[in-house]
A protein has these predicted regions:
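Surface-exposed beta-loop interaction hotspot
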Residues: 69-107
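Short Cys/His-rich Zn2+-coordinating modules
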Residues: 2-15, 37-45, 86-98, 124-126
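Short C-terminal domain-edge/linker segments immediately following a structured domain
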Residues: 59, 87-91, 139-142, 171-176
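Short amphipathic alpha-helical linker/capping segments at the junctions of internal repeats
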Residues: 45-50, 74-87, 130-132, 158-172
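Short recognition patches in nucleic-acid-associated and regulatory proteins
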Residues: 20-52, 72, 103-137
């Protein structure tokens, strides 16, 4: 996997709530995320300021789970982001101060533009290589309204796969499924 030189040490918003430190292993398979070159993502969901769930997932596990999602759902999600996010303009704007403030990437929903402090729930997601966060389309934040839009696009098959994954990983019923994008 290619990545740019735009990276910084894993910032605190992506540290584990449980340990107060960066994630060290994949929440699915247990692989070492600090191994040089290890690619992974971190997703955290919040209800206001409270962490609802969090996980770190190696790229192999992500690819395996993504392969279980319906092609129709994946296409609808891609179309949704193409229609609602100007990724190039977002990256230009955010790269201006990426190294000074990771929070600038995470304080507003990348789709709706809402300030996350004004939402009931939100999720943040980042891409990482060993001890570093990569700035590309990641990191990003999604408000509850954007998540609701995305969930409506998912097929029953995809919702089932994501709910199975959520139940396996967290052993709880979530109001919205884990969105592995």
């Amino acid at each position: 996997m290619q990545y740019s030189d735009n990276f910084i040490p894993v910032p605190e918003p992506f540290w584990s709530f449980e340990t107060g430190a960066p994630f060290k292993s994949c929440s699915v398979c247990g692989s070492d995320l600090m191994e040089p070159g290890a690619n992974y993502l971190i997703e955290k969901a919040y209800k206001k300021e409270e962490v609802i769930f969090e996980y770190a997932m190696c790229w192999d596990c992500r690819n395996e789970i993504m392969s279980e999602l319906s092609l129709k759902s994946m296409q609808l999600i891609a179309n949704y982001f193409d229609e609602h996010v100007d990724a190039e303009a977002r990256n230009e704007r955010l790269n201006e101060n990426a190294y000074q403030s990771t929070q600038s990437w995470l304080d507003h929903c990348m789709v709706k533009g809402h300030a996350l402090k004004d939402t009931k729930e939100h999720q943040i997601c980042g891409r990482f290589v060993d001890e570093h966060m990569v700035f590309d389309v990641f990191p990003y934040a999604l408000s509850d309204l954007a998540i609701e839009d995305l969930v409506k696009l998912l097929s029953e098959e995809t919702l089932g796969s994501l709910n199975d994954f959520s139940n396996k990983l967290f052993d709880i019923d979530l109001s919205n499924p884990v969105l592995i994008l």
